[in-house]
Amino acid sequence: MTDPLMRYFEQELTFVRRALGQFGQQHPEHAERLNIHQGQIEDPSLARLLDGVALLNATIEKQLSEQLPEVVEGLLNVIYPSYTQTIPSVAYIHLSPQGDSPESTIIPKGSHFTSDAKGRMCQFTTVDTLETAPFRLVDTTASSAPFKFNRPAGTEQSTAVIQLSLSTGDPSIRFSQLNHQDLDLFVQGFENNADSIIELLLGQTKAISISDISCEKHIVLLADKLKSRISDLKFLFLPQKGNQFSGFQLISEFFFFKEKRQFFRLKDFGQAAKKIDSSEIKINLFMNAIPAEFMRLFDNHVFKLDVIPAVNLFEQTGEPTSYDQRCLTIPVNADAHSDSDIEIVEVKSVFEITPQGEKPLTPLFRDSYQSDPTTDYWQSARNLSGQFRLAISLKPTHELEFSKLYGTNLLCTNGKQSCGIDGEMECSENIDVLGTFTAIYPPTAPIEREQNLNLHWQFVGLLNGNFSSLLHAENPTEKFKQMLLLCSREQVAAEEVQTIHHVSVKSQVSAIRIMGKNVFSPGSEIELTLDTQNGFLAFSDVLNRFFQQFCSFDRYIQLSVKIYGRDGIAKRYPKIHGSQLAM
């Protein structure tokens, strides 16, 4: 008997003897007939029988313990597919246009870019559509009041302004002729540190205007037209999973991709710019205040146009693999070359290769009433070493022997190799773009999949991570922290979670305006207290959107944020009703 099995055997034997003692106390007459006295067995045959029962139970217990991580990981792959996957590298690609007059070009979401990394070709896929700007950002300045121009109405209380000068590069091309809708900005910040300017834009913007170059004519926009895309559900870096809670992915990407908070969008920019009949305009961001030490730091590198994130994910057809009656599972290989650096992230589909062509198989957990009843099924599993294997469930057949050939469509990554790309990035799509693409920063390092042996407890935590459990928790603050930490990984420093000092949830009925009508609705008002001296607005924006994902159709959610040690509410978000989210 092996040492691990002996340990399980001793545990089961102790349990059996304890059960015998309880049996003797509850049923003394029957225990006496079996020669059981004070938990001791005098009949050697009965003793050997119970030893055999303990050994059988120990064997089963050992097998269950060894298979539990694989079973839990299989369940996670169905409910939270991205939880156990490798987080790929991300490159932030910037277009440097050629010529004096840039042209507008649309680079669709899912476009592929390639770059060389020490002789290996790495492939990246864009996560959003990029409409390149038909103008340049020629200057960025900041100044404090009194201003050298006439300020528009509604900005009287502002004490500082950030001005972005844009030019089409050709006097004959005017902004009134362009059809550029929203303006996407990437905040590179001061010396590649963007946290302070992000907090400034989110917390101090009073009003926005689009003006001519001399600031004589202003088209005023509301301050909330400038939004960070950190909580934009249409701006997700990782592939969306239909059966996965969207709030989990939102929080995860906040922790995994720090640069995501640097993307901003100015809504309705195009409509305002059309009213300026000039080839040069200014975007004026009127601020409540700007620290004096920031004034001289503003230059043409603080903001950038035409930046798009791209993840090191790409689809590839796997190597064909034969399957016969001697196999329980078959391996999945992305590339037959032994020196290949391609890593498999997900098996997307499986098909049988026949003389008549490819015959698709149905994923085991995606079967439905519309599925073909004659089709075969497949399910992929990954062991603790990261090797994917494929299990095939064939329809009933009378054949004792068979041989089939299967192919796979895979989602792959280049792993750590992608961090070494250097130089220009080339667009693989059939798109004519006048300019060069380069990565602003070196691509981020991939985050390896979880290797925690206590994964089953994390799985239980994910299943229990909902608004109801938070509402009825004895300590909602610690419960909320645990929920957020489940969205991160051990390798990632989620410092923002530790700033949460207190969370309280209050249920009440309140007036809310929906579709132009005032109604009374039940809802939940959440008060969050953060203990921080640093920026918090990007984090609170994400938490506000996170809580909204729990909002039912007939209730509302409102988040208020306080800073520990300060009086009053630092940020109160408007009430949002579940019916509004469903529109």
Predicted regions, residues:
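C-terminal domain/tail detector
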Residues: 354-583
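Short linear motifs embedded in intrinsically disordered, proline/glycine-rich low-complexity segments
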Residues: 1, 55-64, 74, 78-83, ...
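Mixed-charge (acidic/basic) macromolecular-recognition segments
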Residues: 1-28, 34, 222-274, 282, ...
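Short amphipathic beta-strand/extended segments with alternating polar/hydrophobic composition
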Residues: 107-109, 122-128, 217-225, 420-425
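Extended assembly-interface regions of large multimeric machines
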Residues: 1-214
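Extracellular ectodomain segments of secreted/surface proteins
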Residues: 57-61, 81-82, 144-179, 298-303, ...
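Short, Φ-rich (hydrophobic/aromatic) sequence segments
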Residues: 45-53, 75, 201, 306-308, ...
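Short, low-complexity Pro/Thr/Gly
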Residues: 171-368, 372
